[in-house]
Amino acid sequence: NQASVIAEFVGPDGASVTLPGFWMQPQRQTCNQDCAVELIDPVGDPVWRIRFSPPLPGRYTYRVDVTDGGETRTAAQGSFAVQAAAGGTIRVGENPRYFERDDDSSFFPVGINLGWSWTGGRGTRGYQDWLRRLAEVGANYGRLYVDVPWFVGLGWRQPVDSLAAIQADAWRLDTILQTAEQYGIALQIVLVWHQGWSAYGGLPVIAPTDPARPNIAADWFSNPHNIQVGGPFQSAAQYFSSPEGRDLFKARLQYIVARWGYSNSVFAWELVDQADRIAPEDPTIITGWLQEMVAYLRQIDLYHHPITSGVRDAARLSLLDAVVLDFREVRFYQTVPIEPAGDQVLATLNLLGPLIQTGDRPVLINEFSLGPWFEPAQEDGLGTHLITTMWASALSGAGGAAASWWWDTYLFPRNLVEYLGPLAAFARGVPWNSAELQPVSVALTGDGSLSYQPLRIAGFNEAFGYMRPPDTLYRITADAIIPPPSSVPAYLYGTVYSAQFSEPQTFIITPPTDTRLIINVSRTSDRAEARLIVIVNDQPVA
């Protein structure tokens, strides 16, 4: 806060970019051969750095100005040449359901969660090995938390406003992003871990002791922002709602963007992983906080990385409606071992279908597994659910393949990351960002004669006033109705009473033979003259 460093770069096209510098303390890692114990210590004097990713090849000029004690001076100026520009930052594509890079090449995320490492995972060295193994199978995506106390904890050191206190964490993130760039992996950076701002109640089941896993019991009561442990805030709600708390987080954002915004290995900024768990007693707090932080990120991130946020419960996605996010994300966990797993493909498509129908931005499943409490090693040791979920999501119209959880205790120990290879190879051959991709109906056929039975569709939602997502299409296939009938209102509303609920229902079906449609109407309202209109293949039939 006592000095600032600003650099101006002018490119070969005459466009200028002004970037802030950042203060850093160089670090050095020391560990034994297998890095079971990782030590990160300061080395040398603190320095100011500026990081710039040139968007074009050619010659650039630069000038560095330093302001200290109210006086500004030019500390350096010169020029340099860039032989070839990198692929560039990832953004929403020409086809808004998918992603692309600045050079217009398609980017279709195929990867897994890589939330963190820890001492038992060989620290930073172990994380680098995971990135290497992902690259070996052709994956291009990972998801990293930078707000956990046992690995990269940018919000977990004291004093909470001290840059010096987070320099070991910053070294880890430097190293990880540089390694990710080497291997062609783009990382979604989770900036706020919800559990650090809520009360952790433990697991409802007993997790196995083998394989080893980090202790993730940290929560608000151990958060360094909590006044009970020396922080400045009485509650998590105060941090997210007060000007002091918001200014503190903006300062962290400013440092994050200045130090790591240059990297093409940053896929996106995820502000909060589960926004509905932050100050749930007053949802307007987190919605207002997200609106303010999204606007601030767009202001300071000149590379325009995509911005998103998530919720735990997909039914609470409306919490994010007022926030202008670049893409949507949802979690998908079944409840193994408490309940047996259901149809994984059908559940995946039912979750994604209503979100994809809007078509206004990409949708990703950012976490999935058979259970949210520990890895499904006993229930699915071969990882069959990984294949079905990733392929179902990739071919559903989502912006990328679903990303599994349990990287450290399931995917890598059992070498299940091999399943990413065929999907990654397939995805590389598809121009996702530019093609006009449309869903199609497919079916298996046989040589023998077939007999057909009537298909009865029932189980509609009988809640009065229930409104489905707008412009939803229902696809009737041999396997299922997508989205399910429970999302179809049982009532059809007219234009006189309850007109706000009036919406046409559209069903898409490809019958295998001549078919008769029968619609049963149990009763009509006696308060207004009702008339049902049925259109088949654009032709009125009733």
Residue ranges with predicted function:
Residues 179, 185, 296, 302-306, ...:
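Catalytic-core region of carbohydrate-active enzymes that cleave or remodel glycosidic bonds
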Residues 19, 75, 99-101, 108-110, ...:
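Short capping micro-motif at the N-terminus of alpha-helices
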Residues 8-10, 67, 100, 522, ...:
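A generic structural motif
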Residues 4-5, 362-363, 371-374, 388-542:
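Aromatic- and carboxylate-lined catalytic core of secreted/periplasmic carbohydrate-active enzymes
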Residues 4, 67-69, 85-339, 347-349, ...:
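Active-site mouth of glycoside hydrolases
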Residues 2-8, 12, 18-83:
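Ligand-binding face of N-terminal immunoglobulin V-set domains in extracellular IgSF glycoproteins
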Residues 15, 60, 74, 513, ...:
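Short loop/turn segments at connectors of secondary-structure elements within structured domains
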